Amino acid sequence: MSTDTIKRYPMPMPFGWFAVSYSDELAPSESRAVHYFGQELVLFRTEAGKAVLMEAYCPHLGAHLGHGIHERSGTGGGRIEGNNIVCPFHSWKFNPEGECVEVPYAKNMPPKVAGKKCLKSFPI
């Protein structure tokens, strides 16, 4: 299929399962930026070994969670701490369900994220 055809007739959001990576391509505590279904996503594996696919942009200031900062993550991808992915800008932590579980410099969780699912996660 040509690039022009794909641009004119983009694939709609699929119903069903699609392979975005092989399991052995993602080690524990590793992440990578991926682009599927017309959107930027982050694919990561928790330290416990659970694979997670979720929206890529932090709701705070829009940092891409899959790019990270090389010096901090060691891989160039987003930093993983336990079961959470950490925003490279201000270290907000998100669990595999997309909930913000920590804002390190705040005494209380900001109302924008307190008890809310901030990022859409996709079943794997």
Go through each PLM region and give its residues.
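Rieske [2Fe-2S] iron-sulfur-binding domain
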Residues: 22-124
